[in-house]
Structures are given as C-alpha cells and as structure tokens.
Amino acid sequence: IGSAGCGPTAMAIEISTLTGETVTPKMTADYSIEHGEYVSGQGTSHSFPANAARHWGLSVKRVGKNRMSEVVQSLKQGKLVVVICAPNTISGSSGHYIVLTGVDAQGYITIADPGSRSRTGKVYSVDTIQSYGRNLEDGAFWIIGK
C-alpha cells in the first residue's frame, strides 16, 4: 500500500466517511487485487473508484474537468469526490488519487491526500483542483454519495 496505495486509501476514506463503517485501505486494496483493479507497477485502475463505491453500496458519477460546478455542488450536498491527478501536479511524476472533502465559505475546496498528511485539510481553489485532474475522456472526478 505504501508505494501504490493512494487509490485504495482514497476509497477507504470515502467509504468509511459515507457509510459509517470501518473500511481500511487493506480492505479496499484486497478488493482491487481480487477484482483485477490493481495494475502492477502502476497502481489501481481508473475503473476502481466506481467499482469499489458500488461494491460498498454507494452511488457514483464520473465527470470531467469541464464539470467543476457539478463537483462543487456535490461537495456542498455532502458528497465526496475522488480525483485522479495528473503527474507532476500535486505529487511526483506519476498519477495520484486524492479526495475532495468539502467547500469552505470562500469557495475553496478542502482535500484529504492519502500520500501527505501535510496536504490533508488544506484548501485549494477550484481552478487549481481542475488543473490537477487528468485529461481523461471519461473524466478524472468521481462524485460519490450515499
């Protein structure tokens, strides 16, 4: 989990928060391996967030970078959002999953970063978060709710 566990950790954060159940990164990592969602040397696949959310009984909607108003509105409604960040944005030279946890009174987005306690709880502008998202045809943002 240490070297390629941001996806399972991000999903454990979301699932535990939204369901009230204790779901650990090991549990979500095991799920990813058992269901072919782990890609050796790369981490978890881009289908993993949606499949894991559904497995634990949550709703999920995948959207692109052009739908940030929907992302912000979903956060205001109490949903959480997983983002697959592009390389060389929020961390290192590879992609990285983070969790968007809310929006403050000034419209900044709060994050939980599975790879950085120092970034967890910090706020970022909508434009910055949008720029971090990967340019994927199916979208880099998974809106997850109950």
Which residues are covered by each model-predicted region?
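Noncatalytic regulatory segments and standalone regulatory/sensor domains
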Residues: 103-146
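Short acidic active-site motifs
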Residues: 67-71
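Catalytic nucleophile-His microenvironment captured as a short glycine-rich beta-strand/loop
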Residues: 6, 80-118
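Cysteine-nucleophile protease catalytic domains, especially the papain-like/related folds used
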Residues: 1-62
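Conserved beta-strand termini and adjacent loop/short-helix elements that scaffold enzyme active sites
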Residues: 63-65, 114
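Short amphipathic alpha-helix with an adjacent loop that forms part of the alpha/beta core around
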Residues: 72-76
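Loop/turn elements at helix/coil->beta-strand transitions in domains of secreted/extracellular proteins
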Residues: 55-61, 77-81, 105-108, 137-138
